């Protein structure tokens, strides 16, 4: 395909499902941490009995534990103790924002189990337990226990190709100051460009179930900007979702022959997405969701001064 000066490629796409947003993790993956052992009290009535009695949730106690277990001999060496001292433990308010229940609500055992699964999916949590521990006067006391992981991930890499060196430096923290937010800064240099990038992700904006993410990259040949705001289906009972995404970047693309630049052109791209979903919630053991959305993409290719039009 040959494009004339100022050629434009524009596309609209109808989405049938939302796109998951991946996260990043640095979890001492080569270590076998001790799992949380907190059994349910033997004298506590069954979940079915408490639900049938119309029990409500009373006090919610949150216990955030450090990375390593001092009571486990496998996790008591000096390196692990140093990691625990340097690590900023997750704030109880960060964990509370993830709970799918609150004091005063009707007790439902499935919400405790779902909360436990959701906590284990967080990149800054290694293990979690959500257990009813006491029942009296129609109220159930809940204990939420979590165990942190190491979340600071520095990285450096070097390479050489075609007679040119490439380097990359990266620093990522997935639980900034214990708030559950991810911040990433990086600098990379390749044969084509040198880039500096900063990104921030907040999974619970102001303690809500809204998620936001922004990033900015400044390159020697352009820049890139991206932003996301999303209200996901965060539980089986969630009745709606919404997402807005915006992305734009510009760069210079080079074509080589025997290591020499023979042609260049400017590539300007932008993309926007608006999507959402509806659900009746959790009914008779089922959750049904209907998702919809629209995506707009625009690519503009322009020759740089002194070069030919791209083909």
Which functions belong to the PLM regions below?
Residues 2-3, 9-15, 21-311:
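Immediate N-terminus of the mature polypeptide
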């Amino acid at each position: 395909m040959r494009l004339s000066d100022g050629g434009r490629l524009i596309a609209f796409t109808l989405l049938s499902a939302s796109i998951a947003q991946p996260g990043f993790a640095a979890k001492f993956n080569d270590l076998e941490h001790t799992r949380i052992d907190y059994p349910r009290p033997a004298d506590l009535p069954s979940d079915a009995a408490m639900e049938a009695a119309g029990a409500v949730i009373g006090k919610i106690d949150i216990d955030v534990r450090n990375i390593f277990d001092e009571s486990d001999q496998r996790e008591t060496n000096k390196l692990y103790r140093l990691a625990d001292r340097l690590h900023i433990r997750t704030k109880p308010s960060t964990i509370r924002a993830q709970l799918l229940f609150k004091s005063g609500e009707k007790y439902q055992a499935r919400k405790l189990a779902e909360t436990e699964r959701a906590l284990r999916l967080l990149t800054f949590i290694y293990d979690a337990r959500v257990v009813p521990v006491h029942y009296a006067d129609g109220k159930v006391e809940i204990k939420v226990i979590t165990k942190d992981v190491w979340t600071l991930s520095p990285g450096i890499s070097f390479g050489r190709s075609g007679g040119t060196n490439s380097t990359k430096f990266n620093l990522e923290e997935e639980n900034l100051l214990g708030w559950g937010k991810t911040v990433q800064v990086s600098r990379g240099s390749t044969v084509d460009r040198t880039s500096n990038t900063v990104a921030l992700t907040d999974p619970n904006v102001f303690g809500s179930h809204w998620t936001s993410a922004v990033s900015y990259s400044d390159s020697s040949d352009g820049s890139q900007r991206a932003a996301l705001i999303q209200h996901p289906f965060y539980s089986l009972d969630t009745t709606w979702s919404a997402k807005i995404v915006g992305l734009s970047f510009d760069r210079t693309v080079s074509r080589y022959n025997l290591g020499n630049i023979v042609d260049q052109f400017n590539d300007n791209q932008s993309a926007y997405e608006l999507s959402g979903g509806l659900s009746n919630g959790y009914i008779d053991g089922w959750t049904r969701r209907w998702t919809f959305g629209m995506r707009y993409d625009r690519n503009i290719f322009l020759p740089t001064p002194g070069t030919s039009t791209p083909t």
